[in-house]
Amino acid sequence: MSENTLQGNATISIHAGEPKEQFGAVVPPIYQTSTFEYETTFAAAEAFGDLHTTNAYTRLHNPTNTVLEEKLAQLEHGKYAVTFASGMAAVTGALLALLSNGDHAIFVKAKYSGTEEVTTKYFPKFGIEYDDFDPLHMEELESKIKPNTKLIYLETPANPTLVMADIEEVCKIAKRHGIKVAVDNTFASPINTNPIDFGVDIVIHSMTKYI
């Protein structure tokens, strides 16, 4: 969980989330284990009963990943961060965590082709409806909200067109209707934009770009 801090982005990037290393190494070690050892079977049972907060299995938690996640959470002014194997895994994971059969979502028209493929190819299989809107014509957004709209998804600046969306205005509209907002912040990076400060619920990055 990210802590409140007055540190700058450079300090956060270098030091956030790094525990006191027993041998004094200045670079966090890379833990390559798949599982972890426990003193007793009771401790192991307790760890596997709370997989969201303990190092029980590397696919879920790993000390190396935790260091990175803490840095990302602090850079984005968020509480938590979760790392995935790819940017599209993060996008898909966020979408499927927030949307279910019968739900409706609204996406910016200009977005990454991989995200476009998720909506056009896979949403119909999951029974999820969606519409696109042009962020340069904000009046389109409210007209496309339905009773079952659960998410508004932005990508700003868009990849690769650099079309911008007014994050703050979108959040105001979304909050009036009780809708969550997710932003792909890849092209801006947390150095230039912190969407959470405007009311966004989830921020997504592909870390092969600017982070």
Language-model features and meaning:
Residues S2, H15, P19, Y80-I211:
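Conserved PLP-enzyme active-site core in the AAT-like
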Residues S2-N62, E70:
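N-terminal "arm"/small-domain region of PLP-dependent enzymes with the aminotransferase-like
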Residues G8-I12, E69-Q74, G199-D201, H205:
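Short, hydrophobic/aliphatic alpha-helical segments
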